[in-house]
Amino acid sequence: MMHALGDLFKPEEKEIKMDRDKCSGACVAIWTWKTIVRLICLIAGGVQVFMGGYIFYSISFTKDHSVQNYLSLSVVGFYACLTGLLILFAETRTRWTRRAVKVFVFLCNGLSRGIIYILIGAIDQSPIPFKFLNIITSMHIGLVCIAGGVVSIIEFLITYRRNRARLNQAIANHQQQAKGTELYDLFEREDFNNPEDAAAYDLEKGKDPNYIHQDLEMQPVQEA
């Protein structure tokens, strides 16, 4: 009985709506920073894939023809290609890929994505048999991946704080709009001098126009 009474006077819950972020100076700065971060991460993924492909290509002219060398080059090349494609997928993802590929859902979070990039860069610091133009080694590519991971984490922290502030503001606005419930309107109704105006007000609010100018406790009780 009490639950039914509570449901009767329970206000209708409305969905919390977040206002679109106004494009201010801070918005432009954050958008520019996110674009730079994504470009850095795309470069890191591209060079990682290039390193894997070059290692596979080096199998054709290696001087060590042992099975162990072939296996090690194949494993390292596969690892580099896989991690590079993973980085490229994470940075070029769309709303469709986020919903369709549930396995890579952790790549949608800037914090976890940055940690994974740093881990990939740390593994690249190991002695991987890669040297391009006698200058670029796997250590340099690993440093690029680590840089992409660091800036990705910084981006996450900046946007998280801003989005959290927007969410708190949306919740405050929602609570302010939902403040006028049926009970509040019932006991705080306007005082009309004209009974016709009061009846029209009650009809507008969906109430019985026969009970005008009286609150719930002040209404007369009809004896049986």
UniProtKB/Swiss-Prot annotation:
Coiled coil: none annotated. Pfam families: COPI_assoc. The chain crosses the membrane at residues 39-59, 70-90, 103-123, 139-159. This is Uncharacterized transmembrane protein DDB_G0281339. It is found in: Membrane. GO terms for cellular component: membrane. Keywords: Membrane, Transmembrane, Transmembrane helix. It comes from Dictyostelium discoideum (Social amoeba). It comes from the Eukaryota. It is a multi-pass membrane protein. The keyword Electron transport does not apply.
